[in-house]
Amino acid sequence: MRTRPAPGTLTVGPVALPDSPVLPAAIAGVAGILFVVLRLLVVARGDPSRFVVAGTTFTDPATAPHGLHIFPNNGYDGQFFYRLGLAPVRMAHTAFGIRLDTTYRLQRIGYPALAWLFTGGQHRMLPDVLIILNVVGLAVLAWLGAVLAQDCGRHALWGLVFAGYFGAVLSLSRDLAEIVAALMTAGAWMVVAIYHVAVL
């Protein structure tokens, strides 16, 4: 691990902000929670399955899991991550009443596989876990970004740049995989940059 400059503080007016990865992680985590709670109460009407944004074009209301809200339209990509989260090893084009729009979806298995792991295969928990994974992922992404920023001699708050990209709002609101994908990329980058792991 490289030697970096001694930690310091960033002063904003009369407030001194510590140079710690915990600060951007906490800011990103709280922002993610507030956004999800507001969306859940205002837009989703208290129903976390609305974050999936399943639509009748690809999701059959007659055979889809009980309790999944299905919109009368195409839906959005979250319905495919939800479907893969129900059974990641089930590679059929149609399962649980949800038809994949393309087999390309099967390659994006990380986020739904993690969700399946944390639900223990309990389908009713999946909408909640998909949301929780993205909120936690946002906080961890900010933490990893802060560690990388510190390694480059910057204040830890620069970690918010990693968590603050515009797509995070869409990922949080529609159960998309970008936050988890960015988290895995930043984690790999940290291992390579800080610990000098050789890359082929």
Placement of each model-derived feature along the sequence:
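Start-transfer (signal-anchor) and selected internal transmembrane alpha helices
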Residues: 1-63
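Short hydrophobic/aromatic helix or loop-helix immediately within or flanking a transmembrane segment
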Residues: 75-123
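Short linear capping/connector segments at secondary-structure termini
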Residues: 95-101, 128-132, 163-166
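Alpha-helical transmembrane segments of multi-pass integral membrane proteins
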Residues: 103, 130-134, 177, 189
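Transmembrane-helix motifs of polytopic, lipid-linked glycan transferases
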Residues: 113-120, 129-152
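Transmembrane-helix signature of polytopic, membrane-embedded enzymes
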Residues: 125-129, 145-165, 182, 195-198
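Short acidic/glycine- and proline-prone juxtamembrane loop motifs at membrane-interface regions
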Residues: 173-180
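Structural signal for the C-terminal ends of transmembrane alpha-helices
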Residues: 188-196
